[in-house]
Amino acid sequence: MRLSTAAALLTGFILAFSPAYDGCGPGRGYGKRRTPRKLTPLAYKQFSPNVAEKTLGASGRYEGKVTPSSERFKELTPNYNPDIIFKDEENTGADRMMTQRCKDKLNSLAISVMNLWPGVRLRVTEGWDEDGLHSEESLHYEGRAVDITTSDRDRNKYRMLARLAVEAGFDWVYYESKGHVHCSVKSEHSVAAKTGGCFPGRALVTMKDGSHRQIRDLQAGDLVLASEGSDGTGDLIYSEVLTFLDRRPITQKHFYVIRTEDGASVSLTAAHLLFMRVGNCSNRGEPKPGAVRTIFASDAQVGQCLLLGKLRKRFSQITHVGVREDQGLYPPLTAHGTVVVNDVLTSCYAAVNRQRLAHWAFAPLRLLYSWTGPDQVLKNGLHWYSQVLIGLGKLLLDSELFHPLALEATER
């Protein structure tokens, strides 16, 4: 009965209020296919995303050269896709060796190339490098990078080829030279964790009595420190924990570790939302209206100002961004849509960088719990409501609003 009631509430809210709907149909273009999104070719020397290749927002750090005798060589797999031509100048098959993630993206790109240019195939000129011919710390040494052209070597196609590579899911694409496009991916065991947004089980929240409790020990109905405004504004208050949007006690994942100059340190997955200061860190006092924005954890950079929430709200400059493996996945949902974790004010939401939209989307669930009380039984796994919203979001929202890893997780 509870499930059907909440489903009805969800449907009603979406049909009544969603700006993505027009008229009586289920969205823009009801009764006909959507017009395909026009692809914009990359310019010469342009790279996407617009950050350096070996930053966490792109393909991530260099992790060391992979050689045939190294333990990590087992991470590489040969690609024998007949729709891809491998130049293989060394005649060793080295260009065919790559990580599984790189292989998946390359195979996807090969299909796009044949669809756009019938009779033309994807061509790989450089893959894994075991000879040390590339620059220091090149991702070619790890099997995480490829240099590509088209089989007809028509350089007029390379700008669009770069765009197709972006669409295929490469984590960094660079129209590097007139002769090829460079593409790379995250490492297999880096932050390519296929999850939405979560905290590790040992993350600490602040209880109403001032004590700290590990997030894995939280129960529905507990009061935890949060922000009165779902957008990070307002006073610090104690908000009721309604449920967990996901709960996986024994899962091992890689988390971003973000530290500030004040000693605060929070661990969370790539797609989780954090509150940051708009602009520079010249004023690190309490946030004023319009001074707060959200970013994905994977976009956090040293020098940015993170919003803390200990005795009062204040900004603190980020001094370190790293990656660490930890156990457990726990994203709590509070009544106010925020929660202070390890003295850092964070969102309860992830996957889509629209805090107000996310808080609005969970309004039916909060309304349900206001009638029935918080979840009495906390089950492991992804909450059914989160699954519904992800499915609806993929139908209604532009894919560019999603974090790449969160969107990828829904497609598996």
UniProtKB/Swiss-Prot annotation:
One of its GO terms (cellular component) is endoplasmic reticulum membrane. The keyword Nucleus does not apply. It is an enzyme of class 3 (hydrolase). Pfam families: HH_signal, Hint. The record marks 269 as: Involved in auto-cleavage. Transmembrane segments: none annotated. Expressed exclusively in the notochord. Ca(2+) 1 binds at residues 89-90, 95, 125-126. One of its GO terms (molecular function) is patched binding. Signal involved in the early induction and patterning of anterodorsal ectoderm, nervous system and somites. It is involved in the regulation of endochondral skeleton formation, and the development of retinal pigment epithelium (RPE), photoreceptors and periocular tissues. PANTHER family: HEDGEHOG, INDIAN HEDGEHOG PROTEIN. This is Indian hedgehog B protein. It comes from Danio rerio (Zebrafish).
